[in-house]
Amino acid sequence: GGRYPTLSFSHWDQLLCMLFAQLTTRQSLRDITTCLRSYSSKLYFAGFRGSVARSTLADANERRYSRIFEALALHTMHIARGLYASEPLGVELSQGVYAMDSTTVDLCLGLFGWTPSAKGRAGLKLHTLLDLRGNIPSVLSITTARVHDASFIDRLHLEAGSFYVMDRGYFHAARLLRFTTAAAFFVIRTREKMLHQVLAEQPCDAMAGIVSDRHVLLTGKHTGSGYPLPVRLIEFHDTERERTLRFLTNNFELDAALVARLYRCRWQIELFFKWIKQHLRIKAFIGNSPNAVSIQIWTAITAYVLVAIVRKRLGAPASMHAILQILSLNLFEKTPLPTLLGNAADCEESDVPVTHQLALL
């Protein structure tokens, strides 16, 4: 579908326009086309096959099927995950480790009336399964804000032996049973008043913050029937924030302290959402239709993953944000990327603490 010729403005031209908008944080259709026009002598060598009119780009985003851009984003995600497959995790595990969460993009109900409103507000949810080896999205889904987080589990092809780390918004007993059936492991934070019956008490390391480590059966009206198997309940005291957290897992072999550290790794997905919202265009949209919004989000994800691929393949020591800044200023230059990035080793983030960037990637 994407290769079919569409007059003088191809899907490839459309993709380049949208990536240009993401990498240079353009604000509107007019902003995009005006800036591209200023590079008219360089467009052909950058891959464009013709000039770009505002109405042409608007019409393409309105009418062309967004699934083409989704497929491209998923393909780049697959490539990037392969590159980062041996990336260290920070925990002593050889299996895959994934964090699952969603972020809400607020929209104006008057402009985006096609999104069902909740409490008088419109919005979208970006459901994400993040591969923590490299912090590359593995699965992404765009829904309206009303869709419950736990329903995202139904879309997943679970990998046997891998760990899936979730917050308590994903607690749904019957869906958690899917992980056990697939020989995959979950680590999920639970509610304090979850009904359960204690089957066995395990020794715990108080020095590591472990308050209790128990084998239990869920006994709630829906949880007991939804997950009828024994499960492990771990209480962990976080001394940094002075709070006690309760984790549920179907893995009975890992050290309890390691389970707590696994849950702590879930913070990486929060940093991922923060990064794309700060540095890419997914909070303000250049089109109001569902198709235009989807295209913009998928090209934002593609831009993020392409930067991650460049960073890994070139072995660039610079942060993701530093690379993004360098690319935004040199998109139409002929200087090779390794040369551009070679002097960026000492670049530091100006708006996000360096410790956060190092934790992100």
What are these regions (language model features)?
Residues 39, 78-79, 282:
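A short structural micro-motif
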